[in-house]
UniProtKB/Swiss-Prot annotation:
Signal peptide: none annotated. This is Cytosolic Fe-S cluster assembly factor CFD1. Keywords: 4Fe-4S, ATP-binding, Cytoplasm, Iron, Iron-sulfur, Metal-binding, Nucleotide-binding. One of its GO terms (molecular function) is ATP hydrolysis activity. Its cofactor is [4Fe-4S] cluster. [4Fe-4S] cluster binds at residues 218, 221. GO terms for biological process: iron-sulfur cluster assembly; tRNA wobble uridine modification. GO terms for cellular component: cytosol; cytosolic [4Fe-4S] assembly scaffold complex. Heterotetramer of 2 NBP35 and 2 CFD1 chains.
Amino acid sequence: MSASSSAISPSASHLGADPKIVRRLSSVSHIILVLSGKGGVGKSSVSAQLALSLSSSASPSDRSRMARVGILDIDLTGPSIPRMLGLGGASVKQSTDGWVPVYTDASQHLAVMSVGFLLRSKNDSVVWRGPKKNAMIKQFLGDVRWGTLDYLIIDTPPGTSDEHISILEYLRTFEPAAVMVTTPQAVSLADNLRSLDFCRKTSLPVLGLIENMSGYICPHCNDCTNVWGKGGGEALAKREGLRFLGRIPIDPGLVRVLDDAKDDAHVELQKQLHQTSLNDNVLKAIDQPLTPHSQSAAAQLPNSGDTESLTPAGTMLSRTTIQRYKNSLTFPIFQEITDQIRDLATKHKLHPQSSVLTTAL
């Protein structure tokens, strides 16, 4: 099967959808939202691992090449994906064909977009009401030059909020699916029931449930201590008719990989100063959405016709992050989970209304 035949193509199935979003996502094969009922369960780390694992595997449409993956961080008030991927100092570029995402490597197999790239400082807060958040999400979908992707992973905020409603409204015709993340704690399990109810009410298919922080393996004796109990996620999945995708233990090595990634992306001072000015313009433009194809947008960069040459080719920091992740004890564990998600996403694409994949009432 060719990449073009497996990708979502503009057609009558997208009637009513925003034309700009249809144009940008027409070559994206699978869209997967990562959800959690509460904060602090490791949802963003699961999103990052899923993106890294998928980009390290073969494309489902062409086994002779590696998968092309995008990760979109719509946790607007708490963006953490840039830091986890070692891209904390990177910035988004403006081209005559829209925003250029940040790539983690020279081969451009993993594209990243987050509001964290647009902030003046990593310590800046995002104090926006619903309409401005919705406009930002719409721009991420409609103005970013995603290109051809096998998977687009969307890291969402915890709980259910304006961001979740907006993203589903914009993506409804693209038949997205979700992966839910919980911990064995009773409070996390209870909060996930609310997220599950949200999925049912919005007819969002759930591919399965991951139990994160499932035990702590001592790096000295390899004994596993179930800090927050055991089996809660699997029991919840069984009770609610979900697929249980697996358990991820607490791995100090993974914590170091994702938390200790440098915030410096070796950006030259003059480019950084220029990008600060550009980012300010981008954030101000959210009230009146930026039109990347306009002359005014192109004029924001000197030589906008040569913007392609400014496309980030991947920093040594991020390549190091990818390699360190592959060397972590968690990588083979999560690879098994990734294999399941990949197979389920393919089945969902072929049979989007399959009762096996949708949560049963």
